[in-house]
Amino acid sequence: MAAAGSSSRFAVTCGLLSQYMRERQQPQPPVTVLEAVAEEEEEEDARTMQLFPPRAAAADGVATPSAGTAPLTIFYDGRMVVVDDVPAEKAAELMRLAGSACSPPQPAHAAALPEMPIARKASLQRFLQKRKHRITTTSEPYKKAAVASPAPEKSFAVAPVKDEPATWLGL
C-alpha cells in the first residue's frame, strides 16, 4: 500500500511541476531559420577558433539547444519524467530545492556492513569446528550408547504353537 501511495504522490508532484513550468514560461517570439543560423554562427565564431576546418564543419551540423531553455529529466522512485523547455534559472532552483530537502537518516551501523560477511564467516568456522569435534568424538553414537548401558538379555520361554514354527518368536 505504501508503494502505491508514494507513486501517486510522485505523479501528482510531477503534474504540479509541469503545470508550474507551463505557467511560468514566458512566451517567446518566433525566430526565423535565417536569424537562428546567423545567431548561431556569431556565437560559434566568438567562442572558438576554426583550427581544424573538417572538424568544425562536422560540428556545424550538430543542433544545439537554445541557451535559455532545455529539457529537464527527473529520475525519482524508479520513474523518469521529462519536462521540455525549462529555463536555466528554474532548473537551478529545482536543484537547490532537491539538495536542501531532508534525506532519510543514514543508519549508524552502515560502517559495520563490510565487516558483517567476515563476522559471519568466523562464526561459521567456529560452528563447523565444534561440529567436526563432536563428530570425531562420537563417531558411532548408537554403538556407544549401547555399550554404555548394556541391556540385560531377555530370555523368554515361549511355548511354540503346534501349527506355527517357533523360530520367529525367539526375540
UniProtKB/Swiss-Prot annotation:
What is known about its processing and modification? Ubiquitinated. Increase in jasmonoyl isoleucine (JA-Ile) levels mediates its degradation via COI1A-mediated proteasome pathway.
Which Pfam families does the UniProt entry name for this protein?
Jas_motif (PF09425), tify (PF06200)
What does the UniProt entry say about where the protein is found? Nucleus
* Ranges spanned by the short sequence motif Jas, renumbered to the chain: 117-142
Q: Which residues form the Tify domain?
A: 65-100
One cellular component term (GO) for this entry is:
nucleus
Entries under InterPro entries matching the protein:
CCT_CS, TIFY/JAZ, Tify_dom
Keywords recorded for this protein, A-Z:
Jasmonic acid signaling pathway, Nucleus, Stress response, Transcription, Transcription regulation, Ubl conjugation
User: GO terms for biological process?
Assistant: regulation of defense response; regulation of jasmonic acid mediated signaling pathway; response to wounding
Its main subcellular localisation, reduced to a broad class, is: nucleus
Motif interval(s): Nuclear localization signal: 119-126
Function comment: Repressor of jasmonate (JA) responses. May act on an initial response of JA-regulated gene expression toward drought tolerance as part of a BHLH148-TIFY11D/JAZ12-COI1A complex.
Which comment does the entry carry about domains? The jas domain (117-142) is required for interaction with COI1.
Family according to the record: Belongs to the TIFY/JAZ family.
Q: Which PANTHER family match?
A: PROTEIN TIFY 11D (PTHR33077:SF52), PROTEIN TIFY 4A-RELATED-RELATED (PTHR33077)
Q: Subunit composition?
A: Interacts with BHLH148 and COI1A. Interacts with COI1A, COI1B and COI2 in a coronatine-dependent manner. Coronatine is an analog of jasmonoyl isoleucine (JA-Ile).
> What is the name of the protein in this document?
Protein TIFY 11d
**Which source organism does the UniProt entry give?**
Oryza sativa subsp. indica (Rice)
